[in-house]
Regions:
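A short beta-sheet element
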Residues: 50, 75-78, 82-135, 269-272, ...
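Short, positively charged
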Residues: 125-163, 313-344, 403-404
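Short coil/turn segments at secondary-structure boundaries
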Residues: 35-43, 63, 145-147, 216, ...
Length: 404
């Protein structure tokens, strides 16, 4: 039974451990989800926050989708306010971010859960604690078990409301939040360093690709093997699931132009298994994203792999596709432009200057990418440290009491 709001402050000041369902957590005013029928993109409309916009604890979207004013007016319950916590409900279940001034007045898509807090909840840090708790192994495990689906796991908002939230004693909660704040400051610095290094590599490519009008351009299939993605087998019984399988979402949602881990593996098929260094490509409405795989990988259905003759040429292709990301709609197909046309991709004309130009570019770009990737790898380690901090010290009886 939900406690009266007047009791919330007392519970939030408690010096004992407590376990709640999210919908009953003191300081939480509402748990809901976004617009079900958003309609078509309206360039003059209200920004719509989508699951893809929530990346690594931030809202990473400078060009959001937009909905018509009348649709927004019909869905004012999900009009974003400062301090709201938004949670991914499809795909990367549980990724979250707090809304800042820049997103006030936006609306939210069906793929996003919305948690609104009371004034007391914000004053006692329930918003900050919940955002961190969603990174705890216990919370991650619970969410994955309650999100049915394979290619696009989906968490119903009814399940989100039942998420177990462990509330530590006030002093311990404050101590944990302070330590995690320090870790996140380091992660933010690393993210900025990585972004700046990649921006420098993009700028170097732009200078390197300036050439006379008659300089050579070639069909992509002439400079790289174009490999179509495959579906994940339904079962791998008796087979060694030995190689990473990259879903389109993992390419699209990767941090930086790198893929170094996937959620699933499969037996390595000879025709489509790719060594590290391959360029992976995946489309979504309005753009195509390209990343370099840092691990051996099989491209999943809805993606394609580009296997250049060497890693240096792979870097050139990566930046060629990055520079044209929003102009490659012709290689996307399907109702939602989420399938890739390998034929169209193979025919795509790419700039291909002489070997010395490509090598000269790659010598500089590879150093910048190494710097960016090192920073992002450290962020992964720091993320694991946050999970450990959240999990350590949980009383054993609560660890076993967390429902599955």
């Amino acid at each position: 039974m939900r406690r009266p709001a007047r009791d919330h402050q007392a519970w939030l000041q408690s010096q004992t451990w407590s376990l709640y369902e999210l919908g009953d957590l003191p300081g939480v005013a509402a748990v809901t989800y976004g617009v079900v029928r958003a309609g078509r993109h309206d360039p003059q409309g209200v920004p719509l926050l989508q699951a893809r916009d929530i990346v690594d604890g931030t809202i990473a979207q400078s060009d959001p989708a937009r909905i018509a004013e009348h649709i927004h007016a019909e869905n004012l319950r999900t009009r974003l306010e400062r301090g709201d916590l938004v949670i991914v409900l499809i795909g990367r279940i549980g990724d979250s971010a707090l809304i800042g001034e820049d997103q006030v007045g936006w609306n939210t898509a069906r793929s996003v859960g919305l948690v609104r807090f009371t004034e007391v909840g914000r004053a006692w840090g329930v918003d900050e604690w919940l955002r961190r708790w969603l990174k705890a192994p216990e919370a991650r495990g619970w969410l994955s078990r309650h999100a049915p689906g394979s290619a696009h796991a989906t968490l119903p908002v009814s399940a989100l409301r039942k998420l177990p939230v462990l509330l530590p004693p006030l002093d311990r909660r404050r101590h944990l939040l302070h330590g995690i704040d320090l870790i996140e400051q380091r992660r933010q610095l690393n993210t900025q360093r990585a972004a700046h290094a990649v921006e420098l590599a993009d700028a170097h490519f732009e200078r390197s690709s300036l050439r006379p009008a008659d300089a050579l351009s070639r069909p992509l299939a002439e400079v790289a093997a174009v490999i179509n993605g495959v579906a994940l087998p339904k079962a791998t019984t008796g087979q060694d699931a030995s190689i990473a399988w990259a879903a389109p979402a993992e390419v699209l949602q990767s941090l930086g132009p790198y893929l170094d881990r996937t959620a699933r593996t499969m037996p390595a098929p000879e025709r489509v298994a790719c060594a590290q260094g391959v360029v992976l490509v995946a489309p979504r409405p309005g753009e195509v994203k390209a990343v370099i795989s840092r691990i051996p990988v099989v491209p999943g259905r809805g993606t394609a792999a580009l296997r250049a003759g060497n890693d240096l040429d792979g870097l050139w292709l990566l930046h060629e596709l990055r520079s044209r990301s929003r102009g490659l709609g012709a290689i996307a197909q399907g109702v939602q432009a989420r399938e890739i046309s390998v034929k169209a991709l193979s025919r795509l004309k790419v700039s291909w200057p002489d070997t010395e130009v490509r090598r000269s570019f790659a010598r500089v770009a590879s150093l910048l990418h190494d710097r960016a990737y090192t920073a992002l790898k450290e962020n992964h380690v720091l993320g694991e440290l946050i999970s450990t901090e959240l999990s350590d010290g949980v009383p054993s009886h609560y660890r076993t009491a967390l429902p599955g």
